[in-house]
Structures are given as C-alpha cells and as structure tokens.
C-alpha cells in the first residue's frame, strides 16, 4: 500500500507555486498562503487530489483500459518514460503530435509503419537493398520512433490521461475533453484546474515533485489488482506546516 505523508510532499517541494503575479485566478481555491512573493499551495487539497486520482486510476485499470502518461517538458520527459515503462503503460515524452487521440486511426497507421521498419531491420531486409535506401528508411524510422515509441503498444484509446504541466499540454487536454477521456493532472498556480477532471495542486517544475506525483500514479496502476488503496498520513497541523515552510529556503524554477 502506498503511504503519502504531508512531510514527504514538503520534502519534494510540492507546495511551491509560481510568483504571485503569475497566478491563474481559478487556482485561488488551492492557495494556502504566500511567502516571498511565491504562492504556497494547500497540501491538504494536494492530498485530496492524490487520493481522488489514485482511485480513478485504479478504476480505469480494473476496467481493462490503460492510462496514457504525458509530459514533454525537460523536467518531466525522463521521469514520464521511466514510470510509464515501470507500470507497462503508454507514454508521450517528446512531442505531442496533433491527433494522437482525436485522429487515433491515422496515428495507428504511422505506428504500423514504424513497426514494419523495425521488422525490416531485424529480418535482414535492409541487407538486400541499397545503402541509399537503407539510409532513407533509417531516417524515417528514427523520426517515427522519436515520437511514437511510447504508444507502439496502445491498441485503443486510453481510459485516462495523466499530464504533467497542463498549460504546456493544452492540445492533449483539448483532444481528451473532446473524446470524454478523463484527465488527471498536476496543476501549478499558473494553470486552469477547471479543465481537469482530477486536479492535483502541486509544483510541476521541480524534478522531485514531478517524480513523486508520477510515481504515485504508477504505483496506483501496479497495485490495482491487489485491492489496496492509498494511505494518507496528515502528520502536520497548520502551525507545523508554516514552520516547515519557513525553514525550507528552497527556490523553484519560476
């Protein structure tokens, strides 16, 4: 069973939002306070967002569907791939190609092309054609692989999408909403939480924070067949929380 504590969130810098001037007004309900012109997120609401997301993910997996992991920014790319692979889920961590959800049948044709090229390389076909043709096919394979490797085994639309930085991944959100696919996302203070089905208020820039959230989603998937949930331990009261925040003189990327 996954155990999440308030202290673990603090240690990962989850509570740090952006500069006050960058606030999206729709995030006000998730703000706890501000410190040095930086918004501090309400970790009680972060914990609730984690719990809701955990339950949704397990429901999706039990229904036989998959969760698509999406995070193309530098801080998220490697983490998204690692955790998606760990839980055997599809992922996009380089570039979102328009239509990956809304025009899925066309994307599947590109995936089939990639698989065909990979097979040709393995079965010796490349050895039977000219070096020029091999070079052209390798360039095509590399281009397709860069953007499609993570969804090669996604045979149907996902049951949910998990996103790091919804402000950056707006096209993903538009496509998922159009198709009625539930969206789980970490929402920082500059984001619009109203377009997210399961918003998790949190720092979407710090690597430790991104890693923590992504691991939680991956853990939910891996534990979906064990009939276990997530244990939330709220081990800090408001006074302790402010004390911890004051002690930590961390800076997030603004």
Curated annotation (Swiss-Prot):
CDD domains reported for this sequence: RPS2
UniProt keyword Oxidoreductase, yes or no: no
Keywords on record: Ribonucleoprotein, Ribosomal protein
GO molecular function: structural constituent of ribosome
Domain of life the protein comes from: Bacteria
SUPFAM superfamilies per record: Ribosomal protein S2
GO BP annotation list: translation
Database matches in InterPro entries: Ribosomal_uS2, Ribosomal_uS2_bac/mit/plastid, Ribosomal_uS2_CS, Ribosomal_uS2_flav_dom_sf
GO CC term, one of those recorded: cytosolic small ribosomal subunit
UniProt record similarity statement: Belongs to the universal ribosomal protein uS2 family.
NCBIfam families in alphabetical order: rpsB_bact
Name recorded for this polypeptide: Small ribosomal subunit protein uS2
Organism this protein belongs to: Borrelia turicatae (strain 91E135)
Gene: rpsB
């Amino acid at each position: 069973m996954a155990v999440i504590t308030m202290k673990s969130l603090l240690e990962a810098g989850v509570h740090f939002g952006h500069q006050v001037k960058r606030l999206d007004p729709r995030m006000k309900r998730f703000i706890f306070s501000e410190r040095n012109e930086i918004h501090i997120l309400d970790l009680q609401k972060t914990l609730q967002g984690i719990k809701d997301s955990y339950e949704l993910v397990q429901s999706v997996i039990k229904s036989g569907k998959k969760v698509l992991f999406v995070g193309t920014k530098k801080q998220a790319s490697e983490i998204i791939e690692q955790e998606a692979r760990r839980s055997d889920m599809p992922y996009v961590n380089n570039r979102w190609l328009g239509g990956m959800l809304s025009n899925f049948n066309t994307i599947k044709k590109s995936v089939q092309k990639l698989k065909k090229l990979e097979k040709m390389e393995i079965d010796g076909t490349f050895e039977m054609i000219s070096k020029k043709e091999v070079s052209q096919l390798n360039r095509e394979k590399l281009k397709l692989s860069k953007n499609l490797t993570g969804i090669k085994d996604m045979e149907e639309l996902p049951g949910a999408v998990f996103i790091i930085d919804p402000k950056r991944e707006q096209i993903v959100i538009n496509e998922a909403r159009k198709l009625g696919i539930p969206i789980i996302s970490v929402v920082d203070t500059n984001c619009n939480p109203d377009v997210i089905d399961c918003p998790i208020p949190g720092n979407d820039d710090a690597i430790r924070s991104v890693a923590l959230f992504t691991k939680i989603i991956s853990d939910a998937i891996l534990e979906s067949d064990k009939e276990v949930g997530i244990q939330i331990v709220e081990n800090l009261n408001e006074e302790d929380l402010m004390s911890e925040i004051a002690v930590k003189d961390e800076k997030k990327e603004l």
